Amino acid sequence: MAKKVAGQLKLQVKAGSANPSPPIGPALGQRGINIMEFCKAFNAATQEMEKGMPIPVVITYFQDKSFTFVMKQPPVSYFLKREAKVQSGSKTPGKAKAGAISKAQIRTIAEAKMKDLNAADIEGAMAMVEGSARSMGLEVTG
C-alpha cells in the first residue's frame, strides 16, 4: 500500500550547506520531519554543485514522518547575476542599469531552466528570462 502524503513544503536552500538552524530546522521540525536526515541527504545530493548556489527544493512528507524531496534549478535571478557578473539588480530598474546581458547568455539560461519554466518552446523561455533581466535592471544586448 502507498504511503499517505501528509503535505508538501517548499524551501530554498544553499547547495551543500543545509543545517538544522533556521529557516530549515523550524520548518521541518514543526512537521515532524527528521531534520538531520534531510540535511545529510540534501548535502549529499548537492555536493557536486557549486557551494552556496540557492536550490529550490520541494519536500513531500508522509504520515509516517518519512519524506522525499525534489530539487529544482536555481532561480533565474541567480543565473542572470552570475552571467552579468553583478552582485544585485538595479534599485531603480526603469532608470538605472545594473549591467548588461547578451541574447546568447539568455538562451543558455533558458535552456538550463527549460524544465522548470512554464514555456512551450525555447523562444517562450527566452522571453521569460529576458523579462526577468529587464525587471532586474539588466540591459539586453543583441
Curated annotation (Swiss-Prot):
> Can you list the GO cellular component terms from the UniProt entry?
cytosolic large ribosomal subunit
Any GO BP annotation: translation
- Keyword flag Zinc: no
How this protein is processed and modified after translation, per its record?
A: One or more lysine residues are methylated.
Mind telling me which SUPFAM superfamilies this protein's record contains?
Ribosomal L11/L12e N-terminal domain, Ribosomal protein L11, C-terminal domain
User: Where does this protein have coiled-coil stretches?
Assistant: none
- Domain of life according to the entry: Bacteria
Q: Which UniProt keywords apply?
A: Methylation, Ribonucleoprotein, Ribosomal protein, RNA-binding, rRNA-binding
Q: Which InterPro entries match?
A: Ribosomal_uL11, Ribosomal_uL11_bac-typ, Ribosomal_uL11_C, Ribosomal_uL11_C_sf, Ribosomal_uL11_N, Ribosomal_uL11_N_sf
Please give one Gene Ontology molecular function term for this protein: structural constituent of ribosome
Q: How does it assemble?
A: Part of the ribosomal stalk of the 50S ribosomal subunit. Interacts with L10 and the large rRNA to form the base of the stalk. L10 forms an elongated spine to which L12 dimers bind in a sequential fashion forming a multimeric L10(L12)X complex.
Q: Which PANTHER family match?
A: 60S RIBOSOMAL PROTEIN L12, LARGE RIBOSOMAL SUBUNIT PROTEIN UL11M
The entry assigns this protein to a family as follows: Belongs to the universal ribosomal protein uL11 family.
- Biological role: Forms part of the ribosomal stalk which helps the ribosome interact with GTP-bound translation factors.
Q: What is this protein called?
A: Large ribosomal subunit protein uL11
Q: Which organism is it from?
A: Sinorhizobium medicae (strain WSM419) (Ensifer medicae)
UniProt gene name: rplK
